[in-house]
């Protein structure tokens, strides 16, 4: 089957002429990587997040109507080596569905594919344990979003449901990831008010790679239906 979706899939053009999907995508491709959209739910409410003002990202409607299970995702991926990497990501926080991540990533590794997990670093808070050792041999690259240089700024910009202690827990999540995962990168959105230089310096101090992410402006209205 290859790259797949759940439900009918149609394309139309927005006012700028961009072709976009009118039905939500569970699996979508960007730059030869295949992204698995696991959930709409997140433990942050970052003020710059596309999911707060749109259903769309890179022309794909990512507001899924049903949560895909592991078998469905495997069926959609089909040939992992076709892609540069299989990325656990989407509109929400993927570690909310840790079991699915472990199930699918094991299958991907069994079929000689590469994996990456995009996360806000709340996985240990969500599951009340250190989940990183459970991902040894399953995740090749961890991309951890860190959009603030202090606990107070993290509250201001990311509005985490776990409160003021979230920031220090994310830092610890990064440290644990560096211990167990082959490649770890900290990513920061280039948004007004966020001290990206401080985030870069923190990444260097911790021993992680650093990548500055483009701020995605709203281009499509949020559909609440």
Where are these regions (language model features)?
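Non-cysteine beta-strand/loop elements that form the S-adenosyl-L-methionine
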Residues: 136-151, 210-216
């Amino acid at each position: 089957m290859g790259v797949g979706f759940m439900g009918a899939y149609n394309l139309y053009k927005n006012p700028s002429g961009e072709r976009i999907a009118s039905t939500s995508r569970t699996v979508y491709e960007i730059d030869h990587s295949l992204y698995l959209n696991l959930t709409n739910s997140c433990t942050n409410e970052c003020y710059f997040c596309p999911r707060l003002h749109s259903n769309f990202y890179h022309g794909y409607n990512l507001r899924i109507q049903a949560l895909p299970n592991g078998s469905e995702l495997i069926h959609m991926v089909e040939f992992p080596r076709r892609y540069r990497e299989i990325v656990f990501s989407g509109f929400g926080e993927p570690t909310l569905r840790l079991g699915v991540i472990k199930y699918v990533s094991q299958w991907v590794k069994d079929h000689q594919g590469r994996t990456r997990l995009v996360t806000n670093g709340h996985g240990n808070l969500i599951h009340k344990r250190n989940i990183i050792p459970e991902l040894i041999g399953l995740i090749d690259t961890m991309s951890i979003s860190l959009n603030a240089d202090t606990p107070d700024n993290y509250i201001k910009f990311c509005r985490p449901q776990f409160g003021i202690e979230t920031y220090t827990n994310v830092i610890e999540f990064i440290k644990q990831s560096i211990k167990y995962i082959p490649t770890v990168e900290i990513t920061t959105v280039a948004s007004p008010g966020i001290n990206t230089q401080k985030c870069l310096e923190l990444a260097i101090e911790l021993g992680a790679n650093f990548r500055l992410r483009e701020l995605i402006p709203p281009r499509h209205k949020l559909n609440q239906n």
